[in-house]
Amino acid sequence: VRRVVVTGLGMINAVGHDKESSFKAILDGQCGIERITLFDASRQSVQIAAEVKDFDPTTVMDAREVKKADRFIQLGIKAASEAMVDAGIDESVERERFGVSSASGIGGLANIERNAIICENRGPRRISPFFIPSALVNMLGGFISIEHRLKGPNLSSVTACAAGTHAVSEAAKTIILGGADRMLVVGAEAAICPVGIGGFAAMKALSTRNDEPAKASRPFDAGRDGFIMGEGAGALVLEEYEAAVARGARIYGELIGFGESGDANHITTPAPEGEGAYRAMKAALTMAGNPKVDYINAHGTSTKYNDWYETMAIKKAFGGKENCPPVSSTKGQTAHCLGAAGAIEAVITLMAMRDGIMPPTINYENPDPDCDLDYVPNTPREAKIEVAMSNSFGFGGTNGVLIFKKV
């Protein structure tokens, strides 16, 4: 079986514009959640989010291309460029067997909203010719493949909050089955706009702690009352092991297992007791050969049911509370980046392995009796991490799990 390794990482989110500054901020427990500035949120019931501040897309794109690309694409290009440089990909690396696996939950939602208003108020002839190409989710992969001349498979995952994780597993499958030797994975999201915030708020999915932005996202805490929307992108360069070794690439880790499942339960609520999440974890563990897992980066959204059911699923997958490794959610820092979350958190997980340190679950102040695992509360923890798991679960009952191992 062809082995899949990770050789490059990149990310941008509310606490950092690159992987190193982001990871340091996450370890330091910095929270990127503040009052919304991307639009006037005064009429919204939820007025806080984790925005990427001071982002200049012209640092990674030609100014003429910027107007053709929605913000989620711009963020994705930034993370992808960092990952490619980090992997040491130069002109000598062959491009025909180098593909892209992109992900987003909602794509160009702000663009859709903006052009719908233009259509209603000024007529359809005033719609931007760049509207459709900038709004489609798969255009993230399209822009990136053009930018880096990647001529292998060009895939896209649109599975809500599990999309970034599924983009990794889809890329891995492509390499394992021989469809490519290298895949650039990018998950990106930028849905902080009136209809995005208003839509999630209407579902009662978001925290309404407008007066305490930095305390609003509190995974596994008894006082949690919903997630906070974030934006950003994560990127990983995946390579077939022998191809990576042949060019002398630095390897962050090997993807030794992945698992996917469907809840078939409810459009937004997870399956009772996290049954679907459990099956995804079990599938990943089985594929990986049931290794000892040293750390889990949880989906941990700060919603009542996700955190409760994910805890139950972890305990079932590992055969009881006493066998569970430490678990943390980094969504207290970055908020929930929706379709980008899985890619961002895969990057965080691999950096935790690299540096031998577990990121903390911040804002963990009041233990919930239903959430009774070790959540690495509030302070990072040094530890030898040989094997780590990353979980993502999305609306529609779609679940994805990744397991990485040091090489």
Language-model segments: which ranges?
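Acyl-CoA/ACP chain-elongation machinery
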Residues: 179-225, 258-272, 300-307, 324-374
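A glycine- and small-aliphatic-rich helix-loop capping segment at beta-alpha/alpha-beta transitions
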Residues: 20-27, 110-124, 174-177, 197-210, ...
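ACP-dependent fatty acid/polyketide chain-elongation machinery
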Residues: 1-65, 242-254, 347-361, 405-407
